[in-house]
Each structure stands twice: as C-alpha cells, then as structure tokens.
Amino acid sequence: MNISLLRTKIHRATVTGADLNYEGSVSICPDLIKASGLLMNERVDIYNCNNGARFSTYVIKGKKGEICLNGAAARHVQKGDLVIICSYCGLSMDEAKKHEPTVVFVNAKNKVTEKRKEDRKNNK
C-alpha cells in the first residue's frame, strides 16, 4: 500500500502576477525551483493564504523572483497574495517512515531565507 506525503513546499511566496490569457501553469523563479527540487511540469497544489483558495496546476520556469499564476488559476489569486506551493509523492509505508520533505521559506521578494528537511520524528 502506498501513502501520499508532502515532497516539497515553498512557504508563503508572494504572487507577482496573474495572467488569465496564458494557457496554464504557475511560473516559478528558477532559484525557488532549484531550492525546492521541483521539476518542470510537475503537478503542484497551491494554497492561497489570503482568500483560502486551493487548486492544482503544474510548474514552468519563470523569471527571477516570479510567482505568476497562469490561465484559469489566475482567477484564484491577486498580485501580492501569499501562497503555499506543495508537491506530493507516493511512498510505501516503510519509505514514509524515513521520508523528510523539503521546505523552502522565502521573503516578500521570493528570495530563499531558509531551506530545511521537515522532522520525521512522528513517523515511527
């Protein structure tokens, strides 16, 4: 049996744009993609801290400092909103006990301020 666990999270990134006319996705700063370990076209869930919206899309490379929601997802955000961007992975129960997701914290300019592995002490 597999279980779905958090793989990586970018915590409280600032939305820099919303482009309704783009075909879809979230454009993410290359530095944040690298720090978090996200992959191009990887599915992500996005949680808007300002309005409570929760939705899924996929990752594309953006410009430095950019977090831009594109296509239909643009309806769920406004410039300046804070969002949490998460990806998940399917693991066996044994793998889940050892798994430590990556969490990336950013400032208001979407620059990495801290990167850490989440503690797995409760997964015994």
Swiss-Prot record:
The active site is at S25 (schiff-base intermediate with substrate), Y58 (proton donor). GO terms for molecular function: aspartate 1-decarboxylase activity. GO terms for biological process: alanine biosynthetic process; pantothenate biosynthetic process. Pathway: Cofactor biosynthesis; (R)-pantothenate biosynthesis; beta-alanine from L-aspartate: step 1/1. Transmembrane segments: none annotated. Is synthesized initially as an inactive proenzyme, which is activated by self-cleavage at a specific serine bond to produce a beta-subunit with a hydroxyl group at its C-terminus and an alpha-subunit with a pyruvoyl group at its N-terminus. It catalyses: L-aspartate + H(+) = beta-alanine + CO2. Keywords: Autocatalytic cleavage, Cytoplasm, Decarboxylase, Lyase, Pantothenate biosynthesis, Pyruvate, Schiff base, Zymogen. Its EC number is 4.1.1.11. Its main location: cytoplasm. Substrate binds at T57, G71, A72, A73. It is an enzyme of class 4 (lyase). Binds 1 pyruvoyl group covalently per subunit. One of its GO terms (cellular component) is cytosol. Heterooctamer of four alpha and four beta subunits. NCBIfam families: panD. Belongs to the PanD family. Catalyzes the pyruvoyl-dependent decarboxylation of aspartate to produce beta-alanine. This is Aspartate 1-decarboxylase. It comes from Bdellovibrio bacteriovorus (strain ATCC 15356 / DSM 50701 / NCIMB 9529 / HD100).
